[in-house]
Design a protein with these regions (language model features):
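Acidic/histidine-rich catalytic neighborhood of metal-dependent amide-processing enzymes
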Residues: 1-26, 30, 254, 258
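Metal-dependent amide/peptide-bond hydrolase catalytic core
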Residues: 32-258
């Protein structure tokens, strides 16, 4: 399709310039168990005599093993995978939803967790996926029952569309000409020089940049203003004020006919 010299995504950066954006992946982990009545809990969690078949296995107990491994991986990432643009603790894994069991009187036979992760811009989605899979596989191999009944990891997790939702990082050079033009235009109109830094969020720019489209984020609003929540808002005065630097950027980048 058509390509532009530059694409500006007017996400709520509060007029900061974001040429760098972390990558993002979503996942779903389904961990099996074996259902039995709760009166058999002692036969689920404790050693059994030789020859006695274990009547049940708690999927929640098994899920906890994987969750702890994920938390440890997150810790190791932030200890050893630093990046010049990412603040400490900026590479993380978040468990967003958990569901397990169907009865108050049974050991759960399945547990499901979904989550998302943001990763440093110097990594690729494939590298991160491989590390996640290796981490979870070590848990599986350490448990006799799970070796025979491994979990199912959907990574990357399919979005509402037909394609897996993979957001690769954006790594536009901070000295790219567009950054200078936006800084200059903003300073000319407002009297303030905007900060050039890494975005705290991902956006549609993550889909465009891997396709060869130079892009960055620069816009009005702030994530603290109810974004993705109740009473999301943008002051009208700020919206009107935003038109001025955008007009200046357009004229300075594209030029004005004489």
């Amino acid at each position: 399709g058509h390509r532009a010299d530059m694409a500006i995504f007017p996400e709520p950066s509060n007029f900061r310039i974001y040429p760098t954006i972390k990558g993002e992946l979503y996942f779903k982990l389904t961990v099996p168990g074996k259902s039995t009545h709760i009166c058999n809990r002692h036969l689920v969690a404790q050693p059994l005599p030789h020859g006695v078949e274990r009547p049940g296995v708690s999927a929640i107990d098994n899920m906890l093993k994987y969750q702890l491994a994920i938390l440890e991986l997150e810790k190791q990432w932030n200890l050893w995978r630093s990046n010049e643009h990412v603040p400490p603790g900026g590479m993380f894994i978040n468990i967003n939803t958990m569901q397990a069991g169907t009865s108050l009187t049974s050991v759960p036979d399945s547990a499901e967790a979904t989550g998302s992760l943001l990763f440093n811009p110097d990594l690729t989605a494939a590298e991160v996926e491989n590390e996640i899979r290796a981490t979870l596989d070590r848990v599986t191999q350490s448990d006799y029952w799970l070796r025979e009944h491994p979990p199912v990891l959907d990574l990357p997790l399919d979005s509402a569309s037909t394609a897996p939702w993979v957001k690769e990082p954006v790594n536009l050079a901070h000295d790219h000409p567009a950054v200078g033009v936006i800084r200059g235009a903003h300073q000319k109109v407002t009297g303030h020089t905007p900060e050039v830094t890494i975005s705290p969020f991902v956006c549609d720019a993550n889909f465009w940049f891997p396709l060869g489209q130079p892009c960055l984020v620069y816009g009005v609003g702030d994530p603290s203003w109810g974004i993705h929540g109740a009473n999301e808002y943008l002051p009208v005065a700020d919206l009107i004020q935003a038109t001025k630097p955008f007009a200046a950027v357009t004229m300075d980048w594209c030029g004005v006919a004489s």
